[in-house]
Design a protein with these regions (language model features):
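OB-fold and OB-like single-stranded nucleic-acid-recognition modules
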Residues: 9-157
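Bacterial Sec-dependent N-terminal signal peptides
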Residues: 1-11
Length: 157
């Protein structure tokens, strides 16, 4: 039996998605509105990711890097010198501007601990400019990541 989900296609970003200017006086909002999930620091998430895995939370930080092809992921850190978490937009259903690096991000979603395949890691490095400091011997990467249901971006002046 086939389900409708098997025919679902991922969304593609529009030119506006890729190029919209991030405001300085308000937030550019993508995905679902940020709700009332508990706000948790990224430092707390990194200290004990299993405590937050699968739970809806809100994190804030600085976008240190983002996807240069579609705007389907960003790396967000507590501050520019801290460890970053990869934020993927849920179900590839919304996108952020390609020039999001340096913006303040407020993100709601769930923490995940997963292993990325070597092929995915290679793609993210070659196509999107991703960086990995902890590559496993077989080329895979085990990482703490964040699946965003909504994101708000504000340009820091």
């Amino acid at each position: 039996m086939l389900s409708l989900a098997s025919f679902a296609q991922k969304a593609s970003p529009t030119d506006k998605d890729k190029t919209e200017v991030i405001p300085t006086a308000s937030y550019l909002k993508r995905g679902a509105p940020i709700g009332k999930s508990d706000k948790v620091s990224l430092n707390a998430v990194f200290r004990d990711p299993s405590k937050f895995e699968g739970k809806s939370i809100v994190v804030e930080g600085i976008v240190v890097r983002s996807c240069k092809m579609e705007g389907c992921w960003a790396e967000v850190a507590q501050d520019k010198d801290s460890k970053s978490v990869r934020v993927k937009m849920k179900d590839h259903s919304f996108f952020i501007p390609l020039q999001s690096a340096g913006s303040l991000a407020r993100v709601e979603g769930t923490v995940q601990v997963k292993t990325l395949t070597k092929a995915m890691v290679d793609h993210m490095i070659e196509e999107d400019g991703a960086k990995f400091n902890n590559r496993n011997a077989d080329g895979t990467v085990t990482e703490v990541s964040f699946e965003a249901t909504g994101i708000e971006l504000k340009r820091i002046t």
